[in-house]
């Protein structure tokens, strides 16, 4: 009779520990990790090249990590679309390319450093009704001017109850690629992954007027988990 693997001490246990300890990686990171490992393999006879390739692979795997998150279950909330630091809370007109009324709305800006996970998650569950990309500059994403001047990609999500929330991916000083995996007509759940920005960036979230903001400037957020606000009733 064949023996069952020992899940407490055997290789299966080690594999389980690795799976629970090391977060998965977003598919967008595979080319970067693969290229770094290829450099390490090609330069395996050179200690410098080998170490540089392995270090680059590890850094890219960490940058593109895609940690699991558990969204809140209570209704009527907006969650953070990104990990990072809240750098601004103010009222501002939504991006002009969305062709929405020029009425200022509450806006929460989250700055992502190189050390943060850079996947973006839906701040609201519902239907994606608009996606608009606008070319721009690549200034420092923590500056107030970044919302207006930098390259950006905006999505509008409408909940089944009719509330609309805007999430804007903004490229930063090092960011050169905004990835958005949703299109108008798609349905997203609260906290679902919808995109990524490579190497330093910012996320602006525009809320419906009358929303009750529950966070402060300087507070850190976890994408898909931190509640930014309660929608007006």
UniProtKB/Swiss-Prot annotation:
Annotated positions of the Pyruvic acid (Ser) modification: 201
Positions of transmembrane segments: none
Site (Cleavage (non-hydrolytic)): 200-201
Catalytic activity: a 1,2-diacyl-sn-glycero-3-phospho-L-serine + H(+) = a 1,2-diacyl-sn-glycero-3-phosphoethanolamine + CO2
Post-translational modifications: Is synthesized initially as an inactive proenzyme. Formation of the active enzyme involves a self-maturation process in which the active site pyruvoyl group is generated from an internal serine residue via an autocatalytic post-translational modification. Two non-identical subunits are generated from the proenzyme in this reaction, and the pyruvate is formed at the N-terminus of the alpha chain, which is derived from the carboxyl end of the proenzyme.
Gene Ontology MF annotations: phosphatidylserine decarboxylase activity
Membrane topology label: Peripheral membrane protein
SUBUNIT field: Heterodimer of a large membrane-associated beta subunit and a small pyruvoyl-containing alpha subunit.
Protein name: Phosphatidylserine decarboxylase proenzyme
